[in-house]
């Protein structure tokens, strides 16, 4: 019977003894000896080759066989021969990667490990950033598995690697040594500059130094994170410095000329120039982030949310923030940013409007109306609706519960210092199909995998604490981030696909709601089991820019049922034309997200913008249904010929009438040109269903 072995690239190949004989003969020649047929026969008699064995396993047997026969020098030569071939293969792999990368259609398509649409152009800087990624993955896995062995034993460590290699779980951001994302407090910078995190800047003293210093600080902080950097105090701090220069009532005198230069600028013009300086600077590619811009997020607050978060906040001079001027500044920035996006493609900041809900509506009527007005003007931002000021976003959709709102001069503005240290994701579609195939209750198997994931995250946390003890995490030491307020996140992917496999209809039905609650409830139960006073867990519906595509590809290759080329990151099928806008809000309502403590954002895709009244009604729908995190996604049209940007979803440029147009839309949580997406994500974007205006709720 023919025997097939597994090569290093995973391909099956017919086993031939001649290749082994040739390799052994070369090893003998390398030490000045000659292998006779009798010698070869003696060595080969130790080998046990069976179908499905890997090349590495057979070569390991050869090493042992040579030593068993007493040929120690030959065994050493054989080991060196293997090592040399390994190095040659790795070098060739890097050369092949380089060639493929430079020929790829864009940077996201060329990236082998973590395709990212935030990298707009591939060049030598992005290539330099890509080459070491495989090494970082190996290093991160070694660090983590060694810690798992120390804490839980080799068996659990091996099981983790097995689940990882078989794609039941996915470790996010393995190409980076840094922790994931953070919503930082800027108070340490306000009182000490950047010296505590390795910079040399003193604290900001005026509006000009605030803007320049803020840019530098965000770049520095982002270089020490693998994900997003949220600055929820940004506009509040800017407002403080504007007041110091132009008075607490500056917003009432916005048209007053205060610049004595030839430009004769008004207060409003100076403020808009500050907006421009900060936003355009932070949208520039950064060398410290492989030539991509920082992932920068900010928050706006209604009056009640602001009071709840910052009621006890005081600036270093003892002054409290003033709501009336901040209210004006928030609205001014939002309107400016909306208009500026018709002049240039500006991805960041990712904005979140934080609103408190009460009795089925937005409590602050002024901000409910203003939010609807900005959506109607074509602005694209997230809205977070909550019954209390319990959470902040530190990423495109990641929600972090606030455990303590108290203010401290030492640590900064209380609960806004939060985030996620690490994300580990379960592939629910594969896990559930595997369980069904093997006659295991899928609930029990999911619980088993999730239990292991919590242990792995605790091992990661110990490694992080060790880095902090060695002085390698200045953001924690300086108080920008509080390690006790950061979460270990369990990500979820393939939930909709798993439900489809089980024959469930992906609509708001009791059966589907029970399935979602049951699975997410298992994860939340484990959170409570493993939580301590020092460690917190949450669960996030993964954005899955990369892994949604990877899971579908890997599962299909291994014979699992895969209904689409990219796994959903919503509770509904994104290409389903039968669902109206209200259905989508309901499917992201409280009964579906109840156990999803780390957040899930509804991207409500619409063909065209709604009226202010319709958006206002949808805010009420969100409050009633308990849909707490959402945005409206209407592709903006960008002309490739004249550069004109239009907020509408058009087939030709309204300015020069060219049909050579591109679209600006959200790949996951952040907005980019569709042409910057990876090929797989471009296909996914083309299949999204954008609801027609008449299917929106009437008022």
Kindly give the residue locations of the regions a language model identified.
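Contiguous, well-ordered alpha-helical segments that form the cores/surfaces of helical PPI scaffolds
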Residues: 236, 488-501, 521, 666
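Core of folded catalytic or high-affinity ligand/protein-binding domains
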Residues: 483-491, 681-682
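Metallocofactor- and cofactor-centric catalytic cores in central/energy metabolism, strongly enriched
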Residues: 269-272, 500-501, 686-691
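Long, charge-rich boundary regions
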Residues: 655-699
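Short, hydrophobic beta-strand segments
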Residues: 3, 45-49, 311, 497-504, ...
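Charged, amphipathic alpha-helical regulatory modules used
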Residues: 1-107, 482, 686-690
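Conserved catalytic cores of very large enzyme subunits
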Residues: 88, 94-484, 505, 509-663
